[in-house]
Structures are given as C-alpha cells and as structure tokens.
C-alpha cells in the first residue's frame, strides 16, 4: 500500500530528491486548474507564475466552473478542454504532463487522471465532492430534475439551483447535464470512485491545508485512502486556509514536479 507522509509548509517532500534521469523542468508540462467561481487570475495565479519562473511549461485555462462560465459544460467537455491544454504543452516540447488543481479543480484533476494517461496529479485543498452529505442535501432536488431532463433527451435544458462554495452560496442556472456531472453523488466527479480508478503508476500528491474546514479535511483524507494501490501517492500539509493553499503549496508542488 501507499506510504503516507505528512510534512509542513515549505518543507521538502521526503525522498523527493531529483533523480539522475529526471527531465529538465522545461520538459514537464503543467495544467493548472482553478477552483469553483475562480479564474486563472485568482487564487492559483501565484502558483502558476512560480512554476513558470522555475522553468516548467505551464498553461492555466478557464474552466467551466469559473465565475463567468457557471458550469456551461459538463465532465466530458472539461476533459476535452484539458486535452486541448495538454496538446498545447506537448507542442511546446513537454515530455511529461501533470495536472495541478485547487478545490473544484483538484477534484477535476483527479477525474482527468482516470480518463487520460498523465504523469502526475496534484490535489490542493480538494473541494466540490458531490458525495458529501451537505452536497447531497443541497443539490438533491436539482439533481433529480436534471436526471429527468437528461432522460427525456433534454441535456441542455437549464436547471436552477443554489450553489455552495464554503460559507458562500449563489443562485445559478446550468444545463441539466452539467448539474448531473458536478452534483450527482454517483456521477463522474465522485472523488472516492475516481481515486480508486487512477491509472497505475500515476503520481498523486494530496496537499492538505492545516486551517481547512474539518469536513473538507475528512473528505480529502478519505479520498487519499481510496487511491489505487498502484498509484504513486504522497501527502503534504501546508500552513494555510482553503483559499491560500495554492500559494502555500508552491515549494511542495515544485519539488514534487521535479521528482516526476
């Protein structure tokens, strides 16, 4: 089984010395995925800039869960959008690919690691777990409506719902398929299911902020425990809250990438 290693902010990963045959940073492509209601210029911007300054090839696309897009596309579409980002990095010379996500982006990165071969997936303060009880209660009526519409062949029909983001919420409307994909406990973003389906040999780094809400800490830990035994998994703690976790994780992510 996997080895669990808890470290603190700005410390090096245990045993993460750079192997003699490790690729140069400019041969590692990194897709950085922002969190819910975020954007590439939000909480993940500093991390993306730090990785670029260390020589990594980095792209940070705006994803369907951004504040502007409001879940305009579902899971299959966001996988395709990450595919496009990977193609861009490959064209620039990337030989290895890692997906680094924050919050909702972390859960999406985990999903991507079940759908495509990647060298690594880093999950920073993973959030947006549709299988958690709070989400089940909040989104159940919208999920039921969306399921009925999709069953009628109306996947693009809009569904209204109250969207949760920590202690904040917004009233939104999104296509039925998107509502199912993001909020159905049995849908494609169930992090427990995806953890068990990560492709063998994929490096998975879980970054847990010490000031995270208790419920999210428990969900992240449970997700980590369900990772496929063949995944190369590791954990790091950073001294930060949920939104500041990407900045606090800069050193840990940089060192982990160098060890791919």
Model-assigned labels for residue ranges:
Residues 27-35:
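Short beta-strand element of the alpha/beta-hydrolase
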Residues 98, 120-122:
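Residue in the alpha/beta-hydrolase core beta-strand immediately N-terminal to the catalytic nucleophile
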Residues 124-194:
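Accessory cap/linker subdomain of secreted extracellular hydrolases
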Residues 51-68:
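Conserved alpha/beta-hydrolase
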């Amino acid at each position: 089984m996997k080895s669990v290693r808890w470290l603190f902010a700005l410390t090096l990963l245990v045993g993460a010395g750079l192997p003699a045959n490790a690729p140069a940073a400019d041969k590692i492509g990194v897709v950085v995925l922002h969190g819910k209601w975020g954007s590439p210029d939000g909480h993940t911007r500093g991390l993306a800039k730090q990785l670029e300054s260390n020589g990594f090839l980095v792209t940070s696309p705006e994803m369907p869960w951004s504040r502007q897009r409001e879940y305009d596309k579902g899971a299959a579409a966001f996988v395709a959008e990450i595919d496009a980002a990977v193609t861009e990095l490959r064209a620039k010379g990337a030989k290895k690919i890692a997906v680094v996500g924050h919050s909702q982006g972390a859960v999406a990165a985990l999903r991507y690691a079940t759908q495509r071969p990647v060298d690594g997936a880093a999950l920073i303060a993973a959030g947006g777990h549709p299988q958690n009880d709070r989400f089940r209660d909040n989104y159940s009526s919208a999920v039921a409506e969306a399921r009925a519409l999709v069953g009628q062949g109306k996947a693009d029909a809009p569904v209204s719902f109250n969207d949760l983001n920590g202690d904040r919420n917004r009233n939104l409307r999104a296509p039925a398929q998107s509502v199912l994909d993001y909020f159905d406990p049995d849908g494609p973003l169930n992090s427990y299911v995806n953890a068990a389906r990560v492709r063998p040999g994929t490096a998975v780094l879980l970054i847990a902020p010490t000031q995270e809400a208790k419920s999210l800490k428990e969900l992240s830990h449970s997700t980590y425990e369900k990772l496929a035994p063949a995944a190369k998994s590791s954990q790091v703690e950073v001294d930060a809250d949920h939104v500041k976790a990407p900045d606090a994780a800069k050193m840990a992510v940089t060192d982990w990438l160098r060890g791919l």
